[in-house]
Amino acid sequence: MSTIVQRQKEFNFFDLWDSFCAWITSTENRIYIGWFGVLSIPTLLAATTCFVLAFIAAPSVDMDGIREPIMGSLMDGNNLITAAVVPTSAAIGLHFYPIWEAASMDEWLYNGGPYQLIVLHFLIGIWCLLGRFWELSYRLGMRPWIAVAYSAPVIAATSVLLVYPIGQGSFSDGLPLGIAGTFHFMLAFQGDHNILMHPFHMLGVAGVFGGALLSSLHGSLVASTLIRNTDENESINGGYKLGQQQVTYKYLAGHNSFLGRLLIPTFASRNHRAFHFLLAALPTIGIWFAAMGVCSMAFNLNGLNFNHSILDSRGNVIRSDADILNRANIGLSVMHAPNVHNFPLVLSSGQPIPVS
């Protein structure tokens, strides 16, 4: 009796590496990973996990660095509207503050360490997700405009979570991670920088509102000009098959004939590619400008101010809405001050200016 023993295949690291690379970059996977995904997936998971834990159970944080901790978690008595991950303490400033830099876990939590962990992992994750969009588009032979459009919210998040704290000198000035915290950040930003009077913010508003208008216009016109392949007793959606190559609506009927007669011929559109490009470009460019505005105001290049009232030839104040706006900004600024129980000097000095 003889026994035949086959020789085992030797371990080859390079063959294993080639298989791993093919799996990472394969477009046949249910979820595309890609090389950017190797970094974006774990960082976003880490940020999400830490955010959920901090949102539910993080202890109070000394955000202003004056030993007056702020309670932001659900277990401290907040609800879903008021709860937030409180930014890192002003005592830490812009220092990198990982867990191993603190003397204890309690100290790390008290100084708001989770905020830095969440923000930095989140920013790495969303920038790599942008790269992942480009990578998948490249491998499928598509053009890169999906990644370009996604760059707008990524830049906006980076401006309020990283650039603004850098410009102001502390992560404590960053956006709190919560609903009420977001509105607190907006009001404080208006009081300190008068963002509503910044031209870049105005362009951002025009872009977002214009994009919303075009989206509703396009959607309603498409839904109104669907091609019917069924009789009147069946739903018009019954004649549609997923992935069909035939057109499903009449672009010229809605965007050219209808708009051209409803408004003026100049507003009519005959080129659906140009219209779809405008639909994507308008909000994207608008958010780019808004993010650039936040980045400029991070270094105190603020919006247009009206610190000096309009005077007549005799030196008397001419009442205007600018005075009301200026006083409102001053009120927001002093209410944002950490020691608000002390009467602010900015309101106790100078001549009173009646606004009504």
UniProtKB/Swiss-Prot annotation:
One of its GO terms (biological process) is photosynthetic electron transport in photosystem II. The record marks Y164 as: Tyrosine radical intermediate. It comes from Trichormus variabilis (strain ATCC 29413 / PCC 7937). [CaMn4O5] cluster binds at D173, D192, H336. Chlorophyll a ChlzD1 binds at H121. This is Photosystem II protein D1 4. Belongs to the reaction center PufL/M/PsbA/D family. Its main location: membrane. The chain crosses the membrane at residues 32-49, 121-136, 145-159, 200-221, 278-292. The record marks H193 as: Stabilizes free radical intermediate. It is a multi-pass membrane protein. Cyanobacteria usually contain more than 2 copies of the psbA gene. It catalyses: 2 a plastoquinone + 4 hnu + 2 H2O = 2 a plastoquinol + O2. One of its GO terms (molecular function) is iron ion binding. PROSITE patterns: REACTION_CENTER. A quinone binds at H218. It is an enzyme of class 1 (oxidoreductase).
